[in-house]
Amino acid sequence: FSRRHKLYREELNLTSPAAPLPLRPEASWLQFHLGISRDGLYPRSSPTVNRLLRDMQDFTTISADYSQDEKALLGACDCSQIVKPSGVHLKLVLRFQDFGKAMFKPMRQKREEETPEDFFYFVDFQRHNAEIAAFHLDRILDFRRVPPTVGRLINVTKEILEVTKNEILQSVFFVSPASNVCFFAKCPYMCKTEYAVCGNPHLLEGSLSAFLPSLNLAPRLSIPNPWIRSYSFDGKEEWEVNPLYCNTVREIYPYSNGNRLLNIVDMAIFDFLIGNMDRPHYEMFTKFGDDGFLLHLDNARGIKRTTLLRLQLLAEPEYRLSDVMRESLLQDRLAPVLTEPHLLALDRRLQLILKAVRKCIDTYGEAKVVANDTTQPEAPASARVKLTT
């Protein structure tokens, strides 16, 4: 299939479906990079983010390649350290005609499919719609720590196979017995065709997450999560068995002062709401120092008052989290992004969080549980119209 397709490309001179535009300072991805600050990846109500989302949906793809993770996996590594089968988490880097880049994660499971209860958190498939929903939830909570993410139907033949120069990526394309064009991750261990993703026959939906600035321009630190999960079937981490573990963390720099521990709590709340049970590390831009925000990518001592107030607002019938999320997600072309049971699950999880906070306040007092921060929270973006009417 690959050899025939290569000849077909050469015959038609299909090197690129469209000539790239010259690099423009006003390009949405560049303006997004320039707008990153100590407070978040983008300002509140940023028009740049909305423009970036539209561009990722509409612009022509001019190249496709494996991500750095997949490229690293193709090299030498200690196979005994790999827990999950290689090839399960397939993702590609797509470049658009304005030279912007996005991470493409294809659909692996249908929206209505639920993870079996017997699955371990480190063997589950990544869900493209979860990436989209996480961005919208992050924006509703006013964290602004998830890169802009949007859904798109990708023609895997024209927008990946015909524009990639990576021969390994070209070699993993095939036509299924149902005449659908499929491809899978190339890696040294368990790259079987049952992990393949397929178009219908060419179109495949997935999520596109905007790239952050390169590490050369904006260095980032990857820091182990103090509450990292165990990646074995029977082992436990210290925080799971030591009731005094949190007190120990609070005495260690940088969690002993500043906002770092409060940001960890924000991250834990976010992960609980989206059902993410696997956050082995978090990243921070080095430019903003120890009190910069935590990046919620592939997104103790107390809770910020602004976070608590926003969560309480989203528990009110007029601004119910599931309703705000439903309205926000309608903007995506792959809507409905979440099924109704998943939306209602957000309300249940929110109630569990507020119940836990109330229990802590009753036990220790509000002064020790709720930390005052300076910025007053705004109403969720999709609910502001209600506030002004």
List the predicted regions and their residue ranges:
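Phosphate/dinucleotide-binding and metal-coordinating scaffold of catalytic cores
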Residues: F1-T389
